[in-house]
């Protein structure tokens, strides 16, 4: 619902649904001129204009759209305190920021808007002739408050409950209106259950959006204050806030001290802020409406100041920690760079030493390989030579022999033959004489010797030994090699035989044969 202002007179026109709830005549019976007028007389025109013209109070219209939470309990609101459930008509009062909460429904929001639209014309009674409008304005407020008690979550029943509120007598409501200061004190006194939630949204809360300075925050319901801001502005930042940061703060008065009646002792910070803002310092309880608004305003400012200091402190701590981390990282980086340089230098030296060792090892290995190659070559040659000598000596008796061995073997065989083998040669010479008989002019000694040779030849024939021709004589070798004379005599014999056979010198050959036989 919207509240429309007239151009000059400031007369507020209400929505048709709210204006039709009751008749103007019925509202006068429920109007409480004495007590409500006393509250309105406490406001000066300047203070009211200052609150209405506050520039940063025009941003709260969105925060009033919060839906009620079904889990929250129903507010225990008295019928005569309907002004505490009212909402600002498009952000005209700083006290309207705490009116919405989880338990609000659309009917309560409508009642708040309607009440504020009647509240300000009532303040204009002092200077303007419009004085009959406030009484009919209070009738719907009373009935709407009763509907909040009976059915807080239904929208169809307010007209039915409104009629019951109209029929109610004034005697039952007047004593409850006199309890207004106590209810206002209950609003200022944040219960322990409310305080943590209220503190959660203080740091991100701008000065114009906090609910402690609004005119519609006069409700005795403490649940309406905490959740008005976090649900619209920064619900994600509400969790990490300290719940007991402001309740235990020495800058604010304890909530339980604002209840009841008696002397009121404020903190130095609250007094200083009140003086700076130009408000009078309250000294006794219960508080009036103006004192309540002023106190809420300065408490909001103090809370904002505390939250700002806390955020700055945390930011400073965070920056200090970051600076320390940067310093530690930079020092560690320098140390690591130095270590890297040292390791690089050692690596270079190790590489140089490794290269030197490799060159030395390669030189030594090449020399040893060469020496080993020459040694193995000589060893192989010696081994081959030894094998050649060994196998050569082994195969001498079976393989081809030199001339000396050829001459030695027949001589060994000839030694085993009887003496007649040599006689055969000489007898062959005698047989050779038969073809050409010698002259008989030889001496008788020689004839006797020839007879001996004839007997030797006859024996040879008897034994079956055949004579060999003279051609074989050069190939026949005397077996006795013990003396050089034997070989020489054999060669001379062969030459002489060949020469004397031609010259008929057989006698000399016979003599040579005899000499040879005697040597054997």
UniProtKB/Swiss-Prot annotation:
Induction data: Up-regulated by ER stress at the transcript and protein levels, the increase at the protein level is much higher than at the transcript level. This induction is accompanied by increased proteolytic cleavage that releases the N-terminal transcription factor domain.
Entry keyword annotation includes Endoplasmic reticulum: yes
Segments in the Lumenal topological domain: 401-520
Modification note: Upon ER stress, translocated to the Golgi apparatus, where it is processed by regulated intramembrane proteolysis (RIP) to release the cytosol-facing N-terminal transcription factor domain. The cleavage is performed sequentially by site-1 and site-2 proteases (S1P/MBTPS1 and S2P/MBTPS2). N-glycosylated.
CDD domains in the record: bZIP_CREB3
PROSITE patterns: BZIP (PS50217), BZIP_BASIC (PS00036)
Listed Low complexity bias regions: 208-220, 234-255
Record bears the keyword Phosphoprotein: yes
Family statement: Belongs to the bZIP family. ATF subfamily.
Disease annotated for this entry: A chromosomal aberration involving CREB3L2 is found in low grade fibromyxoid sarcoma (LGFMS). Translocation t(7;16)(q33;p11) with FUS.
Role according to the record: Transcription factor involved in unfolded protein response (UPR). In the absence of endoplasmic reticulum (ER) stress, inserted into ER membranes, with N-terminal DNA-binding and transcription activation domains oriented toward the cytosolic face of the membrane. In response to ER stress, transported to the Golgi, where it is cleaved in a site-specific manner by resident proteases S1P/MBTPS1 and S2P/MBTPS2. The released N-terminal cytosolic domain is translocated to the nucleus to effect transcription of specific target genes.
Protein name as it appears in the record: Cyclic AMP-responsive element-binding protein 3-like protein 2
Organism from which the protein derives: Homo sapiens (Human)
Gene: CREB3L2
């Amino acid at each position: 619902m919207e509240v429309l202002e007239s151009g000059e007179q400031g007369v507020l026109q209400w929505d048709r649904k709210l204006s039709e709830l009751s008749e103007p005549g019925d509202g006068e019976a429920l109007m409480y001129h004495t007590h409500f007028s006393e509250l309105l007389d406490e406001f000066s025109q300047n203070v009211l204009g200052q609150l209405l013209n506050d520039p940063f109070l025009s941003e709260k219209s969105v925060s009033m759209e919060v839906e009620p939470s079904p889990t929250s309990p129903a507010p225990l609101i008295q019928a005569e305190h309907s002004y505490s459930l009212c909402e600002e008509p498009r952000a005209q009062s700083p006290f309207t920021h705490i009116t919405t909460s989880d338990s609000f429904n659309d009917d309560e929001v409508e009642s708040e808007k309607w009440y504020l639209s009647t509240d300000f014309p009532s303040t204009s009674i002092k200077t303007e002739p419009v004085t009959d409008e406030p009484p009919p304005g209070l009738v719907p407020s009373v009935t709407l408050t009763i509907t909040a008690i009976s059915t807080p979550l239904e929208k169809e029943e307010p007209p039915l409950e409104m009629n019951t509120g109209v029929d109610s007598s004034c005697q039952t409501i007047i004593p409850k209106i006199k309890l207004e200061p106590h209810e206002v004190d209950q609003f200022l006194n944040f219960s322990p259950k409310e305080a943590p939630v209220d503190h959660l949204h203080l740091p991100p809360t701008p000065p114009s959006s906090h609910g402690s300075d609004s005119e519609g925050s006069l409700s005795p319901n403490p649940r309406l204050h905490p959740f008005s801001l976090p649900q619209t502005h920064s619900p994600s930042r509400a969790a990490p806030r300290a719940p007991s940061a402001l309740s235990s703060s020495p800058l604010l008065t304890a909530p339980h001290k604002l209840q009841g009646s008696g002397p009121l002792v404020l903190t130095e910070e609250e007094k200083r802020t009140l003086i700076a803002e130009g408000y009078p310092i309250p000294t006794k309880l219960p508080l009036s409406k103006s004192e309540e608004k002023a106190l809420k305003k300065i408490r909001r400012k103090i809370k904002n100041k505390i939250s700002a200091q806390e955020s700055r402190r945390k930011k400073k701590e965070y920056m200090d920690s970051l600076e320390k981390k940067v310093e530690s990282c930079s020092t560690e980086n320098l140390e690591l760079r130095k270590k890297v340089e040292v390791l690089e230098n050692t690596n270079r030296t190790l590489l140089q030493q490794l290269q030197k060792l490799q060159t030395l090892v390669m030189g030594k290995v090449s020399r040893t390989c060469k020496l080993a190659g020459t040694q193995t070559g000589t060893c192989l040659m010696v081994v081959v030579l030894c094998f050649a000598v060994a196998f050569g000596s082994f195969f001498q008796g079976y393989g081809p022999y030199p001339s000396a061995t050829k001459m030695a073997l027949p001589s060994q065989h000839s030694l085993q033959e009887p003496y007649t083998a040599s006689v055969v040669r000489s007898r062959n010479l005698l047989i050779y004489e038969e073809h050409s008989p010698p002259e008989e002019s030889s001496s008788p000694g020689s004839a006797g010797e020839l007879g001996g040779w004839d007997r030797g030849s006859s024996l040879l024939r008897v034994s079956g030994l055949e004579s060999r021709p003279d051609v074989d004589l050069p190939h026949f070798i005397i077996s006795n090699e013990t003396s050089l004379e034997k070989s020489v005599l054999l060669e001379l014999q062969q030459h002489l035989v060949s020469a004397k056979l031609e010259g008929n010198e057989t006698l000399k050959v016979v003599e040579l044969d005899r000499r040879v036989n005697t040597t054997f």
